[in-house]
């Protein structure tokens, strides 16, 4: 009994300390499926409610709670995390990497994802219940006067934590794909699934910051008395802009991984490379760009300028063209192919058919006139569910069936899989096709008494239960596979992408030797010694015969650092942060406890970095063009890109509020900054910040020349200037508050405090980073190429902090 308990505890400890990308991928998959079961159960509840007119199965509040949480989970906590479960496991294998660039950040991203979802679900157990304002969280319904209690606060907090998780994951995947590809894997030799994840994380990089900013402003409105979404100067339209600038790219964030998985599946089981791959990748790139200029088609009926509506109508129709190209590519790949109708192939083709239906019905909504008629009806519900359920969910299930033998080393029942597919397709059709005919039924009614709607709603409810049953069959199939499934061969599908060139499941180090993809597309495995001896280019070009060169397997994967990658730090850090923020709404002592845990865990994390416990440099043979072979600097540039979106959202809100004619007419005038603030104080802080940045340049030169005194002087000078800046800012705020210019002094002061507060928070993070470098210097570890990368990364960070201030100063102190 004791030995079993010890074994169980060891098993639990392994999973809570793992940083291996394959383990993290499995955690994402299992957790996202659990969230799917919750969201699906909520959907069945409100479908039962709608099956009968004047039903009392659910109260109005219960119905709206179910719809709201269902939508949020499906949008945020199921589809993307499921895709990233597959991506965590498969992408490093497809590009020949040992792991993601930052294994601990990968684990931290997962734990933040899990805990954010639990925070959302915790809202059900509050006195006010879960949020019931709809998954779009439209203002002004979200104001405390209309939605009291902490349920909505917890939902906003959950979204904030989830967005933080996404940011960390985005950095990790972009750096991994850009700078850790095995020799010979150029950009166009990457499989479609890896390409789709690359486009996805690029979208995430700029789509999630507006949501995070919007969520933060919502929490301020509800808890500190600001009026960003209540005052007519901001109001519902400001929320619409922030939410939908995230919301429409989110559609493609969900769609791209499914299309990538479908492409790999269709290519494999057609026996042909994907048709016109380079053109499709170009189309996906164009779609990625256009996706950021279509969000206002969700706002056609808000009274925006007719020419603005016309522009967004055109972009909405234009963005369909890249996806039409993808559909044609898949069809031409299938045409005259050696088709093998396996379970993953059936799901991929079924998802393709659903995509045609969902996509074509969405194009109608690009018309301003048609959108006016369909907006807020079940036509829209049917359209986006054909995309999100019929295409995204089934496409990702195709990927799961496809890679299941690789992930588990087990086979599954083809018969159960085909039953799963048939019922899923039937369920999608019965659930959502009737809803196109319900184009005159408002989508947010919890009951109705119109007889003509009854048969269609009952068909839809029947379809929902059939679809739910199909998912249960799929789950049984996977569980059966784990218990009774036969052993899977390393490459059961005779595929040609790199993940199939290792065992099923892969070993901890992924590959025995370093995979090299030669110019003729053959794959060889060599040791790191051979790469160093013969050179990467010679092996890739086939000028060297490596068939008899030993792999030296133990050495070739030692750089993965498996012996010391296990750590509880990501879990404890995520738990501390979540507890600290959760406690603000539930219990202040809980918040204090969480803050202590967070700070201690962060200190422990950074101390290990000071001691270079996890320090790893990229091997010299990786493909990284055109990016630097420096993952720390690359990660900082990616983070800076997300910061551009974050502060871009804040400044966009500033301009929207300041120049909104409705706000000017109904509210107080926006005063010139020089009448409110002392320009000299702003100028002094500008000089302080610029001086600190120049001193940091001195520190960089000191590390580069290995000069301790110059480095110390530069870092201490930067730290002093940053603290001086914060001190000046503190006394400036204090004087404003004494003068009665607090958050209750109007939108101008609210915008000022939010903008300068966000900037000050970034200065504090800079202080933390500079202190870390100082501690590392005192410990004698701030030297060499790794240290130079860290110093340069922190210098880049100080640069963006300085640039933001050059915008804050004139906007709030001069004009």
Curated annotation (Swiss-Prot):
Keywords: Cell membrane, Copper, Electron transport, Heme, Iron, Membrane, Metal-binding, Oxidoreductase, Respiratory chain, Transmembrane, Transmembrane helix, Transport. InterPro entries: Cyt_c_oxase-like_su1_dom, Cyt_c_oxase-like_su1_sf, Cyt_C_Oxase_1, Cyt_c_Oxase_su1_BS, Cyt_c_oxidase-like_su3, Cyt_c_oxidase_su3-like_sf, Cyt_c_oxidase_su3_a-hlx. Residues 545-815 are annotated as: COX3. The keyword Transcription regulation does not apply. Fe(II)-heme a binds at residues 70, 385. One of its GO terms (cellular component) is plasma membrane. Cu cation binds at residues 248, 252, 297-298. There is a cross-link at residues 248-252 (1'-histidyl-3'-tyrosine (His-Tyr)). The chain crosses the membrane at residues 26-46, 71-91, 105-125, 157-177, 197-217, 242-262, 281-301, 314-334, 339-359, 380-400, 419-439, 463-483, 580-600, 637-657, 683-703, 708-728, 736-756, 758-778, 791-811. Heme a3 binds at residue 383. CDD domains: Heme_Cu_Oxidase_III_like. It comes from the Archaea. This is Heme-copper oxidase subunit I+III. The lineage of its organism: Archaea, Thermoproteota, Thermoprotei, Desulfurococcales, Desulfurococcaceae.
